[in-house]
């Protein structure tokens, strides 16, 4: 069960990173410029985009806001019985 939880966290971080990278590229911003806008080190941008960032939530939010994005929380969706039967 712990392994599955870690995989879910990993997938969430990878998805966040993909969204950050996509938004940055769409805006034509390089990592160094985004780092300046968010007042973080360029390394933070790289770690976020690769889904391996382990720093503070505040820094991640600073990067997200610098891209003109926001974070929305929603209840976790659990698999349906049909989805579980198909595994």
Model-derived features: positions:
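Short, charged recognition helix plus adjacent turn
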Residues: 1-4, 73-87
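A short, Lys/Arg-rich alpha-helix, primarily the initiator
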Residues: 2-26
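Short basic helix-loop element that most often maps to the first helix and adjoining turn
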Residues: 18-37, 62
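Recognition helix of helix-turn-helix/homeodomain-like DNA-binding domains
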Residues: 39-53
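DNA major-groove recognition helix of helix-turn-helix/homeodomain DNA-binding modules
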Residues: 58-74
